[in-house]
Amino acid sequence: MNRYAETHYKFRLPWSPLHRRLPEMIVDAPWMAAPGREVPLFLCVHDAHHFPVTLRAVRVVVRAGGEMHKTEMTFDLRLDNPFHWIDLPWPGPKTVGENLVDVLFEIEDGKGRRRKFVNHNLPTLAPQSLSVLRMSAALAFPSGWTSGDLHCHTSWSEDPVEWGGDPDVMRRAADCQNLGFWAATDHSYDFAWEHPDWLVPTDPVKRFRAFRDSLPKDEPGRSVVLPAEEVSCGNRDGRNVHLLVIDHPEYLPGQGDGGRRGLRNKPDLSIGQVLAETSRSGAPAFAAHPKPGIGLVQRLLFRRGDWDHADLLPHLHGLQFWNGKIGDDFRHGRALWVADLLRGNRRLPIAGNDAHGDLNRATQVSRPLFQLRQTRRHRFGHARTWIYLDSEPTRTSIRTALAGDTATILSDGPFLSLRVGGATTAQERSSSGIELRATSPAEFGNIRAVRVYAHIKGREKEDLLLNATPDAQDWSHRMDLPSGALYLRAETETSKGHRALTRAVEPR
């Protein structure tokens, strides 16, 4: 599980090695910064209403380009709210390349005892430096393309094991990365419980409306924030799976795997029932991490399952099989999407990261009650969904694009263009045949592989039309369109392990 980790909950046990009578305190900053952008740096504080402390001093050290810059500040700041997000200064210039950041902060508890920590105060974790990549140039996507993170969580997702990021903080991080949009896909089961007392039931309809009203509104030049919901619902076997619903106006109940009802873990609604609701509002709906690799404990305690062909029902717009990292969940989810394409459907692929805040890295509970760990596999804004818009991004234009026939590319860095004669959108249409272009920023390595797949009429599987190994930063290629091609799609990888893939493009 990826998140700002909740360490205080003990499951009614008398003791846990993760429990400290201090608030959780984590230093965070975006993992990447677009050229010339200011990098916001935060001290994120959770549960200080239970464990009040006073922030006394902060020292920030940044190492980049062979130089070290630092700044120090003294405070007399009382921390006693459920959440605090404290801005910290960034010392030194905007040095291109990797910037390593370390923050030493000193606090005083209620008994007057002073303690110092580096980057966080979480038990069992070493204080690793934050790594911020300042890009030398913008990502190489042509004008009109805009990118977003379509699966992430804010502070409205809060429960016994996790808490998410502040929406305004996440928007500043999105602006730093030049994200055009992001979806606050907070858990359906968390809306049914009070804040900050997340074990006290509340009215989920009222809380969901408050959530929608609280999100930052459209503002020129800033990332668009999409109100959304990650709905727990029942698959063909009656097991809990997750469905991303973008900008549906009403709350959709789903507490099956929320962990607060004990063994009463059956889904509240089926996939079909949820899609019936979204079809009425026109809200885009996507299968979330459809092949996550569910362990035995989650299957038993939370009745969790995965998506299969029988679950890909009408009014489902696509599949989010890229969930931050590249692993078996990505490969098996992509295989499910391809199998759906071969059946004649043209659902969109989308990418997200399932970040709960997690601007620089994610904190995980690796062993409940006993051990934490950190990973960079689920960082906010890392795996992106790129869409083409004819106008300035707004909540309405992005919602419309995701629900319709829009040119789409998934990427964690490189650009990949696939153009085919007769395609429905201008961004995917060539004058004749197949046109390819792949480019990668220097920071992400050279293009080392480009593959083109096609479904030829009468065949049960895709054909591999091209398997090129260019080893170049900018590469283009033309080839003939095979007879009987029903769709084509393309993928690319770089020498540093970054990748991009297109949606399925139909020749006409």
Task: Annotate each language-model stretch with its function.
Residues M1-A140, G144, S157, G344-L348, ...:
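C-terminal functional module detector
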Residues H153-S155, R303, L464:
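Compositionally biased, intrinsically disordered low-complexity segments enriched
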Residues S214-E219, H309-L312, R376-R379:
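Short, conserved catalytic or adaptor-binding loops enriched in Gly and charged residues
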Residues S157, G262-Q374, E443-R459, L486:
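Domain-core and long-helix interface of multi-subunit machines
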Residues A126-P127, L133-A288, G295-L296, Q320-L336, ...:
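A metal-dependent hydrolase metal-coordination microenvironment
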Residues V200, R304, T424-E428:
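Alpha-helix boundary/capping detector
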Residues T146, G221, R239-V241, S281, ...:
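Residues that flank catalytic or metal-binding motifs in active/ligand-binding sites
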